A protein has these predicted regions:
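Terminal, contiguous helix-loop blocks that mediate binding/assembly
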Residues: 1-492
Length: 492
C-alpha cells in the first residue's frame, strides 16, 4: 500500500516553496513527492540569460548544462514559478480579505479563528480535506506550512485543533514560516506580529505532533535580527524568492525519512521520537550544499564537522546549536565515488578509516559527536535538484554538480544538483528562543490592542497563553542554560 502525506497550505504564500498537495505514485526506492520541491517551477518568458563570456573560454560540454537565468525581478509569489498543475480542490480562496492590502489587514490572530467559525469557510476546508484524505491509500499524517505571525496563525490553530480530534492517531508536523524581513514596519504592526507569534507558538504546538519555526532570520520577536549565513551561498534576504528557496531545500531534505519507501519511517514514528516528555517543538538546521571538494570524500568532510559541527540554524532565536536530546539527521546526494577516504593508510587515526558506505560514515559521526543524544540517521542517494526556477544562490566555487571546486565555474553555467544535510532536533537551544519571546510578550498590556479584544481574545486567555509559553521554554531547560539564565538575572 502506498504511503502518502497531505500538505495543507494556503494561496498566496509569499515564501512560496512547499510540497504540493498530492498522492503521487512511485516505484520502490523513489521519493513520495511528485517533483522535488526545489524544482517546482516554470520556464517562461521571464527567464533572462545573462551575457555570455567569449566563446573561446567556454567548455563545449557546458553548452548542454544548466544556464544562468534571472527571475529575481519577476517572481513575486509561489504561483509565479509553479510547474505542476494543481488539482481544483487544492486551493481555497479567502474572499473576506485581500492579499497584502493597505487597509483591513489580516494581521490579528482572532480574525483567522473567526473565519473558520463561518459556515462557508469551515465547510469548504472540510470538504477539500476529506477529498484528499479519502484519496490516500494509507494516510500517515499531515505536513502543514503556515504563516504564524498574522491571521493565518489563528485559522491554522482552529484547523489543527479539529484535525487532531478527527485524526488523533495520525501525525501532524507543522512548520511556521517567518519572513526574513518585513515590508510594513511600525510599533503597532510589530506588536501585532509579536502577539500573533506568541499565540501561534502555544496553540500550534499544542495541536501538532511537532511544531518547528522556520526562517533565515535569527529573531522570533519584534526584531527579525541578523540573517543566517551559509558559507557557499549568497542571497538577498529581502526576496522571498531567495529565502523561500533556502527553506524549501531544508524542508525537502528533513522530511525524507517518511517520504522514502526503502528504509523509511512513519511520520508518527519521527514526531513521537522528537516530542518526548512534552517537548513539542523542534529546531531545524541545515548545510547547503554539504561541502565535498573535487578531490575529497564524505569521510574527510565529516572529519572537519567532528571538530566543529557547522550546520546553520533555520530556527529563529536558536543562534547556536544547544544540547540535542533527540535528532533526525538526513544526508543526501553524496556521489558513490566520494564516500571513503582515498588513502586509509595515510589517515590511520581517522574515526572513519574503516567506513565503507555513507551510512557507516554518518552513523560513526553521530556516535562520536553526539554520544548522549538519541540519533536517527538517514542517507538518501538522490541529491537536491536546483535547476530552473531555483534561484541562483551558489557561489562561483560550487561546481555544476554541487562539489566545492578549485576555480570559479563558467559565468554562463548554473548549478544543477547539490548534496545537503539537515538536522531536525529537540534541543536546549529552543529554551533561549522561547524565553526571549516570553520576555517580550509578557510585557504586553493586551488591553491596549483593542482589535485583538474585538476579535474575541479574552485577557485571561492571553495570560494563559503567556504562561504556556513560559512552561514550554522550561521543558527545554538543562543545567547549562539554567546556570546561564541565573547568571543573566544576577547581572541585571
Amino acid at each position: 500500500m502506498a504511503r502518502c502525506t497531505t500538505c495543507w497550505r494556503r494561496m498566496m504564500r509569499s515564501t512560496g516553496w512547499a510540497t504540493s498537495l498530492s498522492t503521487p505514485q512511485t516505484h520502490p526506492g523513489e521519493l513520495l513527492t511528485e517533483e522535488d520541491a526545489s524544482s517546482a517551477g516554470t520556464e517562461d518568458s521571464h527567464d533572462e540569460v545573462q551575457e555570455a563570456t567569449p566563446q573561446s573560454s567556454i567548455n563545449p560540454l557546458e553548452v548542454f548544462r544548466s544556464k544562468l537565468y534571472n527571475l529575481d525581478d519577476s517572481v513575486s509569489v509561489w504561483s509565479d514559478f509553479l510547474r505542476i498543475h494543481l488539482h481544483p480542490n487544492t486551493v481555497s480562496i479567502l474572499s473576506e480579505y485581500a492579499h497584502d492590502p493597505e487597509q483591513d489587514m489580516f494581521d490579528v490572530f482572532g480574525y483567522g479563528q473567526q473565519l473558520l467559525g463561518t459556515q462557508r469557510v469551515s465547510a469548504d476546508l472540510e470538504d477539500r480535506m476529506h477529498f484528499f484524505v479519502e484519496d490516500c491509500d494509507s494516510l500517515q499524517g499531515f505536513q502543514v506550512l503556515v504563516d504564524p505571525y498574522n491571521g493565518f496563525g489563528g485559522l491554522a490553530a482552529e484547523v489543527l485543533e479539529q484535525m487532531s480530534e478527527d485524526y488523533d492517531n495520525k501525525g501532524i508536523l507543522t512548520f511556521g514560516c517567518y519572513p526574513s524581513m518585513y515590508v510594513r514596519r511600525s510599533p503597532i504592526v510589530d506588536y501585532h506580529r509579536l502577539i500573533c507569534t506568541a499565540l501561534s507558538v502555544t496553540k500550534l504546538s499544542a495541536s501538532s505532533s511537532l511544531y518547528t519555526p522556520l526562517s533565515v532570520a535569527t529573531g522570533l520577536g519584534r526584531e527579525p535580527g541578523p540573517m543566517a549565513s551559509f558559507p557557499y551561498l549568497t542571497y538577498n534576504p529581502s526576496l522571498h524568492y531567495h529565502t523561500g528557496g533556502i527553506l524549501a531545500t531544508a524542508l525537502d531534505t528533513c522530511t525524507l525519512p517518511y517520504r522514502t519507501r526503502s528504509d523509511g519511517v512513519l511520520m508518527t514514528e519521527l514526531t513521537n521520537t522528537l516530542n518526548y516528555s512534552g517537548r513539542k517543538m523542534a529546531a531545524l538546521s541545515a548545510r547547503l550544499p554539504f561541502p565535498i571538494t573535487l578531490d575529497g570524500a564524505l569521510a574527510a568532510s565529516l572529519s572537519q564537522f567532528v571538530a566543529a559541527p557547522d550546520l546553520v540554524s533555520l530556527c529563529p532565536g536558536v543562534k547556536e546549536p544547544g544540547r540535542s536530546f533527540m535528532q533526525s539527521v538526513v544526508l543526501r546526494g553524496v556521489p558513490p565515488n566520494r564516500i571513503c577516504i582515498p588513502d586509509p593508510a595515510a589517515h590511520a587515526d581517522s574515526i572513519f578509516r574503516d567506513c565503507r558506505s555513507a551510512n557507516d560514515c554518518l552513523k560513526r559521526y553521530l556516535q562520536y559527536v553526539y554520544p548522549g543524544t538519541l540519533n536517527a540517521g538517514t542517507v538518501v542517494h538522490e541529491p537536491l535538484t536546483v535547476t530552473t526556477p531555483f534561484p541562483h544562490l551558489f557561489n562561483p566555487e560550487i561546481t555544476h554538480d554541487g562539489l566545492v571546486g578549485f576555480k570559479p565555474r563558467s559565468a554562463v553555467q548554473g548549478v544543477e544538483k547539490v548534496p545537503g544535510m539537515t538536522s531536525l532536533s529537540s534541543q536546549s537551544g529552543l529554551q533561549g528562543s522561547l524565553a526571549a519571546l516570553h520576555g517580550e510578550v509578557e510585557k504586553v498590556d493586551i488591553r491596549r490592542f483593542h482589535r485583538f479584544l474585538d476579535a474575541g481574545l479574552e485577557e485571561d486567555d492571553f495570560k494563559e497563553a503567556v504562561e504556556s509559553l513560559r512552561q514550554l521554554a522550561r521543558a527545554y531547560q538543562t543545567s547549562d542554560n539554567e546556570m546561564a539564565e541565573d547568571s543573566d538575572d544576577d547581572s541585571d
